[in-house]
């Protein structure tokens, strides 16, 4: 027999309260504290909105600035992600992960309190036009540090935490930046724990097209190599300064991975580097980063390096075996997602001069990314994302 919305909601609230109570190292905030911190959730303090609620900037009683994510009461799917995020992030700390201050589970309120990060996310800054739109200067040194920082954060999740953690939604909008442009991986609502002695987990596919590894998107088989694929896409976005998909570009330039492979085969990868750097970058290092991106996005998961190896490759501690670089795996090889265009003949630099990054270009997700702290569950419900078992 089914239950009424009210009785189901009460049972759900009780279950959430029970799970939160079982977590020892999570600070529980009173709802009135949250109201005071946000000036009663004033419009001036609202910094974003996603499919599962809103995010506010707040000042806690101890003077700390916080990003306060309020889960919508109408969202039932979001409760699962709410609990997942608390369970995952409350147990771990790393300089390249967001820090959870605590939560509020008073009555029907479900609120997460994070450290506030001043410079938003990569998709709202670098991929939205860089300095021109965000006021942030992403020189080559800053980009390299961001790439290495994200890689270190993922290596920590994949290899140092027990059980290992697969993030499942690595993308530009989930990489937040502090005032020093140090990257923090955020949004653990879709994260999965990898039990010991298991090679993969079969699960409902969730994430964002453009970052999804083909074997995961098509078969639902999740391993750490799916995160590594997503990182490879992100790495190429950071170096090129463009999203993995940009429909405002000519057809032959729209898909970043295909473009990178074409240029790699012609030994012209340097043409993919962001022209916004005005030639002020280490060409050898930039091309090495792009080749690492190709390594991470190879069709066979077994050929993708581990994240600790990626860190060593990025920092130059390990040389790239160029013989191991093969064509990247593309979902479009398995599913009819797009119409292919002709092979490009012009260089990327000419293309970059004629077609700059528009603010409306797509990075694989159709939702408003003004909410850099929005729940990963939103990704699963965006118009161009997967959210079904395949």
From Swiss-Prot:
Molecular-function GO term, any one: protein serine/threonine kinase activity
Regions of compositional bias (Low complexity) in chain numbering: 354-390
Modified residues (Phosphoserine): 173, 202
Residues that coordinate or bind ATP: 47-55, 69
SUPFAM superfamilies from the UniProt entry: Protein kinase-like (PK-like)
Keyword RNA-binding: no
Any GO BP: response to freezing
EC number, as in UniProt: 2.7.11.1
Catalytic activity: L-seryl-[protein] + ATP = O-phospho-L-seryl-[protein] + ADP + H(+); L-threonyl-[protein] + ATP = O-phospho-L-threonyl-[protein] + ADP + H(+)
CDD domains cross-referenced by the UniProt entry: STKc_IRAK
Highest rank taxon of the organism: Eukaryota
Record key words, sorted: ATP-binding, Cell membrane, Kinase, Membrane, Nucleotide-binding, Phosphoprotein, Serine/threonine-protein kinase, Stress response, Transferase
Phosphotyrosine: modified positions: 114, 216
Entry function: Negative regulator of freezing tolerance that phosphorylates 14-3-3 proteins (e.g. GRF6) thus triggering their translocation from the cytosol to the nucleus in response to cold stress.
Name this polypeptide is given: Cold-responsive protein kinase 1
Organism, as annotated: Arabidopsis thaliana
């Amino acid at each position: 027999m089914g239950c009424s919305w009210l009785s189901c909601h009460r049972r759900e609230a009780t279950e959430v309260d029970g799970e939160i109570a079982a977590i020892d190292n999570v600070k529980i905030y009173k709802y009135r504290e949250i109201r005071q911190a946000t000036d009663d959730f004033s419009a001036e303090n609202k910094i974003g909105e996603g499919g599962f609620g809103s995010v506010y900037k707040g000042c806690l009683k101890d003077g700390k600035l916080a990003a306060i994510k309020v889960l919508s009461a109408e969202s039932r799917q979001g409760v699962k992600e709410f609990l997942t995020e608390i369970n995952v992030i409350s147990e771990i700390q790393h300089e390249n992960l967001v820090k959870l201050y605590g939560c509020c589970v008073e009555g029907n309120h479900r609120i997460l309190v994070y450290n506030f990060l001043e410079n938003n996310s990569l998709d709202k800054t670098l991929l939205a036009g860089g300095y021109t739109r965000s006021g942030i200067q992403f020189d080559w040194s800053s980009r390299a540090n961001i790439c290495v920082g994200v890689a270190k954060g993922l290596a920590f999740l994949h290899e140092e935490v027990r059980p290992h953690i697969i993030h499942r939604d690595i993308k530009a909008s989930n990489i937040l930046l502090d005032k020093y442009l140090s990257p923090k991986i955020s949004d653990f609502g879709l994260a999965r724990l990898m039990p010991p002695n298991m090679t993969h987990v079969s699960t409902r596919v969730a994430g964002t097209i453009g970052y999804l590894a083909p074997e995961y998107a098509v078969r639902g088989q999740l391993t750490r190599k799916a995160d590594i694929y997503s990182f490879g896409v992100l790495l190429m976005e950071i170096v090129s300064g463009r999203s993995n998909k940009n429909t405002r570009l000519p057809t032959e330039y729209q898909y970043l991975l295909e473009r990178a492979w074409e240029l790699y085969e012609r030994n012209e990868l340097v043409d993919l580097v962001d022209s916004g750097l005005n030639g002020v970058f280490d060409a050898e290092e930039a091309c090495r980063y792009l080749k690492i991106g190709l390594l991470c996005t190879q069709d066979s998961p077994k050929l993708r390096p581990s994240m600790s190896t990626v860190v060593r490759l990025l920092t130059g501690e390990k040389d790239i075996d160029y013989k191991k670089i093969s064509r990247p795996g593309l979902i479009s090889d398995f599913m009819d997602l797009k119409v292919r265009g002709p092979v490009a003949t012009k260089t990327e630099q000419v293309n970059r001069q004629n077609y700059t990054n528009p603010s409306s270009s797509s990075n694989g997700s159709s939702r408003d990314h003004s909410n850099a702290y929005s729940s990963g569950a939103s990704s699963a419900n965006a118009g161009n994302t997967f959210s079904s078992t395949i």
